[in-house]
Amino acid sequence: MLLAHAYPDANRVVTGILELTLNAIEHGNLNIGYKEKSRLIEEERLDNEIERRLSDPLYSSREATAQFVRRPDRLSLHITDQCKGFEWRKYLNFDPERAFDTHGRGIAMANKVSFDRIEYRGNGNQVITALQLGTVAPALVA
């Protein structure tokens, strides 16, 4: 992902950028909920459903935007989608209840590994990431 190369450590942020962008598209603009995504993955139909919705006039005109800002002390990324929002707080941290689900850890990965901070605004359809310049990636637990 090209945008990751704007950061001092592209490997640190690439997963977070990808996960938050995919969330804006899949869960936001295409309105695929958590349980529905679980079912579609189980039935091996997620890709087909995404393609179907991308062709559906109800969803096809929706846009997700990403704005990258470089400041002297930090880098930030603001991603906005056109969804009705969601309850994002329960996804900020890793949850043992979802540990073995086929998805559902992207926001926590972005929050705990990729960026120093993420913040949701509005109804949950806007996320802002921050990475302080000069910080070191958190150590991963073995």
Residue ranges of model-derived segments:
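Glycine-rich/acidic phosphate-handling loop/turn and adjacent ATP-lid/helix
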Residues: K35-G104
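Alpha-helical phosphate/pyrophosphate-handling elements in metalloenzyme active cores
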Residues: M1-D9
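General structural signal for secondary-structure boundaries
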Residues: A6, N31-G33, V69, S76, ...
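Flexible, glycine-/charge-rich segments associated with ATP-binding catalytic modules
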Residues: R74-H78, Q82-E87, Y91, P96-F100, ...
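Conserved ATP-binding N-box helix of the HATPase_c
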Residues: P8-S60, N111-K112
